[in-house]
Amino acid sequence: MTRGIHGRWVRFAAIAALSMMLAPAAGRADVPAPYPGTKTIETSKPYGALVQSLAAAIKANKMGLVSKASATVGAKSIGKTIPGNMVLMVFRPDFAIRMLKASVPAGIEAPIRFYITENPATGNASLTYRTPSSVFNPYRNAELDAMAAELDVIFAKIASDAVK
């Protein structure tokens, strides 16, 4: 009888442990802004127009468009179609030098990204980015914080100009 109770207890404990491990995964939902400092601007601009206006705003605000990556372009290359989706990576050499002088490990954060997504239901696009201060905050470095505060103003202006 002791063995029977013990066996049931072990099975119960195993099932309970498994349930607790699986419960968070089953209850998870997509979090649109999982990081602090994430800004999303819904626009009435079509995807292509927002891509163009963001590139122009980056240039007008004297920042560099370091690179672009597009899942939409990648999907098209294999014969698939998905809603507009592009990341534009932005920085500038003088900020890179200051960043690396303050913290070499922080170099992984640059360039800072703008993310454009198309709403297939409306055809309108959204612009999302993380404020530079939130990107660099985890490094707890006064020089990075000062630089990030300058970049916050520039990135907010780029976003504002792009969505006009």
Give each language-model segment a name.
Residues 48-55, 72, 152, 156:
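Extracytoplasmic/secreted envelope proteins and their assembly/folding machinery
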Residues 37-45, 85, 137-145:
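Second-shell loop/turn segments in exported
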Residues 55, 59-115:
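Compact, glycine-rich, soluble single-domain proteins
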Residues 114-141:
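Beta-strand/loop substructures that line and gate deep hydrophobic ligand-binding cavities in soluble
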Residues 29-62, 164:
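Terminal, regulation- and interaction-focused segments at domain boundaries
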Residues 131-164:
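C-terminal partner/receptor-binding element of secreted or periplasmic proteins
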Residues 13-23:
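Bacterial N-terminal signal peptides
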Residues 2-14:
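Bacterial N-terminal signal peptides that target proteins for export
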